């Protein structure tokens, strides 16, 4: 693996929160994915999201990060990471999760679908 990538294994909730808070970007490169909690958690902690354009990921990220289609787009991902994004984009990602995907709104939507 690249020296900038670490495989950490299982982490506690506290460890995950610390990792998110100390990370500028969160990458979700799934080929199939519903609505990944990990992207929501990372954005809530201020990570700028980068995700594949599949299922629920674009709904979560919106215009607060980068969406890509295939492995061929990884040059675009690299350029995005090196573009100098910072505090403003981090705050936008956090604000989007709080306003659109907070737990109360998610529970209400589930209740609406059940009724």
Predicted regions and their residues:
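Short alpha-helical segment that forms part of, or immediately flanks, the ligand-binding pocket
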Residues: 17, 36, 40-44, 55-59
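Aromatic "clamp/platform" in nucleotide-sugar-dependent glycosyltransferases that forms part
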Residues: 31
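Structural motif corresponding to alpha-helix initiation and N-cap regions
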Residues: 10-14, 71
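Short hydrophobic beta-strand element within catalytic cores of glycosyltransferases
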Residues: 48-51
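A charged, aromatic-enriched C-terminal amphipathic alpha-helix characteristic of glycosyltransferases
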Residues: 72, 85-115
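Short alpha-helical donor nucleotide-sugar binding micro-motif in glycosyltransferases
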Residues: 18-23, 28
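Nucleotide-activated donor-binding/catalytic signature segment of Leloir-type glycosyltransferases, i.e.
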Residues: 1-10
């Amino acid at each position: 693996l690249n020296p900038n990538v670490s495989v950490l294994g299982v982490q506690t909730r506290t460890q995950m929160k610390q990792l998110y808070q100390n990370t500028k970007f969160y990458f979700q490169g799934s080929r199939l994915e519903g609505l990944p909690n990990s992207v929501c958690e990372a954005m809530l902690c201020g990570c700028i999201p980068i995700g594949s354009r599949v299922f629920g990921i674009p709904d979560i990220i919106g215009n607060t990060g980068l969406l890509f289609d295939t492995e061929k787009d990884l040059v675009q991902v690299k350029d995005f990471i090196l573009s100098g994004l910072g505090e403003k984009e981090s705050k936008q990602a956090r604000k989007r999760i709080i306003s659109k995907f907070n737990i109360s709104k998610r529970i209400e939507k589930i209740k609406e679908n059940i009724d």
